[in-house]
A protein has these predicted regions:
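Substrate-binding cleft of extracellular glycoside hydrolase catalytic domains
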Residues: 99-230, 234-236
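Catalytic domains of cell-wall/extracellular-matrix polysaccharide-remodeling enzymes
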Residues: 199-280
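Functionally critical loop-and-helix segments that line ligand-binding/catalytic clefts
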Residues: 98-109, 259-320
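Extracellular/periplasmic catalytic domains that process cell-envelope and extracellular macromolecules
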Residues: 96-97, 118-121, 161-163, 198-203, ...
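Secondary-structure capping and domain/repeat boundary segments
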Residues: 27, 34, 320-386, 403, ...
């Protein structure tokens, strides 16, 4: 009795443990934010961590980001929140469709914790390189701009690169003359060169001229300074960009002149309620910058200043074109490509796939232990109780061919899964009451016992096709009561026992009803014995 009590106590503890574990199983996203290019797809399962096999996804804005079979699809520019839920927990992720989210940092942000920044979904960073310029005569003029590289430049660039965060450079300007603008350009180029080629070659965003220093210059004079700087940067092999707020872009610069020269613009317009579903234009104009500084109070931990401040930005992705691929009138798939760029779609090639046979007689009655047949019609003279045939179709679905009631087996080889096979190969089923094929996966959907053909057709050229004959048997070989794929003495023994104990066949034992009268009886046992004698 004591032993029984101990066992019961152990069972109770184990059950309680698993109940407790299940009650506190959680599902969450591995990042809080994710950027998607418009018309791209994202497998949501790939960014989920879960202790629970059962969870669902919902989207706050299906017009922007829709969800089909756990795949997020970016439909247009905007922001959407996707929620994952299981019976115990929920979590959310912010999807930015058509734009990246980033920060801009300098020495004032201290030692930025770049791994922590990356973990919070930051895609890019604008890093201050320097301010002013170096001139040995500045001291005499009362200016103190010597050696003004940002002291955290090297550290910040390395941190961004090490954490796969794209980055660019910005330089704070004090220039009041063309000559000073030239010196500032030379100064920022020297700061960039100090990084070394290993870092420079990984800089993917522009070199920015930060224009916000108070000035009494005219629009033309200040614009001349900006153009001078940008020209020097271009000549050095970098792409220039101009940072300014509304006052500077509208009242202190010739905006139309800058846009006509196709310079990238970075617009400072912080707001407490940013709208991410429309691109931000410079106030009072229809000019859309490529980058928008939307906040000075970012909440990205590990990058804030000592006062808790952090500049937040969005970088608009290039305009996208949707390319749709059709088979006649049916949309097969779609792709996104940057406007003005080309899209290469690799057409599939039908490739050979084999059938592996074990233990059959060839047409000269020679016993063959094992072989593989490729891309040809094949007829095998087989002893049905010995042959084992497994066919491999696209997506590695396995079908067991039932050979019990035929001596000769003929079939064509189904093509091997190739590039884009789901999008470019159609399946034709002769008798869909027996089986169907999922058009997008190539998986067989069996419906009832029977034999039919599946023809695989290359959509781009309907003359390229291959056919497989498929036998579907949802249960087991008739008479194979012990389910070892052979009808043998053990099956006969089982059949006799069933006959002695039961006159009516149980539903799950009907594969032993060899004469199809709905009852397992002496006749079935006799037939099983005959099959066994033939094949032992």
């Amino acid at each position: 009795m004591r032993k029984i009590k101990i066992i019961l106590l152990f069972i109770f503890i184990v059950s309680a443990f698993f109940s407790f574990s299940n009650a506190y199983a959680t599902t969450n996203f591995n990042v809080p934010r994710k950027a998607m290019k418009i018309y791209d797809k994202l497998d949501l399962n790939s960014i989920v961590q879960s202790d629970n096999n059962s969870y669902t996804f919902t989207t706050s804005n299906p017009d922007v980001v829709s969800i089909i079979e756990n795949v997020a699809i970016a439909n247009k520019f905007g922001q959407a929140t996707i929620t994952v839920s299981d019976e115990n927990s929920t979590d959310t992720i912010s999807i930015s469709s058509g734009y990246y989210v980033g920060i801009d940092v300098s020495v004032w942000n201290g030692d930025v914790d770049w791994p922590r920044v990356k973990a919070q979904g930051i895609d890019f960073a604008m890093i201050r390189s320097s301010y002013g310029w170096y001139d040995e005569y500045d001291a005499a003029a009362g200016k103190e701009y010597n050696f003004q590289y940002d002291k955290k430049l090297q550290r910040n660039v390395k941190g961004a690169i090490d954490n796969d965060i794209q980055f660019g450079i910005y330089h704070y300007s004090y220039a009041d003359t063309i000559a000073e603008a030239e010196m500032e350009a030379e100064y920022v180029i020297s700061a960039i060169n100090s990084l070394g080629d290993e870092y420079i070659n990984k800089m993917s965003l522009p070199v920015t001229y930060d224009v916000e220093h108070v000035t009494t210059l005219s629009k033309k004079e200040l614009t001349d300074i900006v153009v001078t700087f940008c020209t020097k940067i271009t000549e050095a092999g970098y792409k220039p960009m101009i940072y300014a707020n509304t006052d500077f872009f509208i009242n202190k610069l010739e905006l139309s002149r800058l846009t006509s020269m196709l310079y990238d613009l970075w617009y400072a317009w912080p707001t407490s309620n940013p709208n991410f579903n429309n691109k931000m234009a410079i106030r009072g104009t229809d000019v859309v910058p490529i980058m928008w500084q939307y906040s000075w109070e970012g909440d990205i931990a590990g990058a804030q200043t000592s006062g808790g401040e952090l500049d937040m930005d969005v970088l608009y992705m290039k305009d996208r074109v949707k390319v749709e691929v059709y088979n006649l009138d049916t949309l097969i798939d779609f792709y996104g490509v940057n406007k003005g760029e080309t899209l290469d779609i690799e057409l599939p090639q039908l490739e050979k796939e084999g059938y592996i046979f074990e233990g059959y007689l060839d047409q000269e009655d020679n016993l063959v232990d094992s072989s593989t047949i490729y891309n040809e019609d094949t007829r095998l003279d087989a002893k049905f109780s010995k042959i084992k045939i497994t066919s491999i179709i696209p997506v590695n679905t396995q079908l067991e061919i039932d050979s019990v009631y035929t001596k000769y087996i003929s079939f064509d080889i189904l093509p091997k899964e190739a590039s884009l096979v789901d999008e470019t190969i159609s399946y034709e089923v002769a008798d869909k009451t027996i089986l169907d094929v999922e058009s997008n996966t190539g998986k067989i959907l069996p419906r009832k016992d029977g034999k039919t053909t599946v023809t695989c057709v290359l959509d781009s050229d309907n003359s390229i096709k291959a056919t497989v004959f498929v036998n579907v048997h949802l249960g087991y070989v008739k008479g194979d009561l012990d389910r070892n794929n052979l009808v043998d003495a053990n099956d006969a023994s089982i059949a006799l026992e069933i006959f002695k104990s039961e006159s009516q066949t149980q539903e799950d034992l009907k594969y032993g009803d060899m004469d199809d009268n709905g009852i397992i009886d002496a006749n079935d046992a006799s037939l099983i014995l005959e099959v066994y004698k033939i094949n032992k």
